[in-house]
Amino acid sequence: MIKLQEKYDIRSYFEQYTTFENKKVLDFGCAYGSFLNFKPHQNYTGIDVRADCIEQNKKKWPQHSWIHCDAFNTMYNVNGTDKLKLTSTYDICVSFSVLTHMRLDDIVQTVSTLKEHCDNLYLSYYSNKDKFAYETICDFRNIPKSQWEDINKNLMFYLEYGNLLWTFFDDDYIAQKLKARSCRTSFGNDDYRGLQRCLVI
């Protein structure tokens, strides 16, 4: 069984336990580069399926490397055709709320690729034990809350609404699948994406 740490803000976790100085950092699913807002870094690469994010980031932070990957993603890139390909290696990979919107087969394949190119991975996900996270998503997206019992009883559960997908995992199940240990995370209550655990691989 995976031991869960106490709740913490993942930003504080990075400040306390992760040394980024002189490290090559890959931000997988970087979106608009929010990682740089709380952890400025010199040797940073952001990768995302959204071309508009990458183009905007190139203008805002031209000193960093930005990669557009046209990979399939149920929520953000349904027409994507590529698989994740990396040509460099990195000391650290961070990924916030990306596994949340992927199916298990895609997660396993993606994490396998990331592990080949990154020494340390920090990947967030939703737990099937966290009713508050589930209810917060439902409130935020106007989704009926009738599925919690199903989510709570399964090792893996997909909550689909229109073309949106949220994936919930049993902690031990996903940690075993990805050969990881799990840490408990908590952002502020105003950010539902932060109500996640973080796999440390």
Where are these regions (language model features)?
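Active-site charged/polar residues at nucleotide-handling catalytic sites that mediate phosphoryl
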Residues: 88
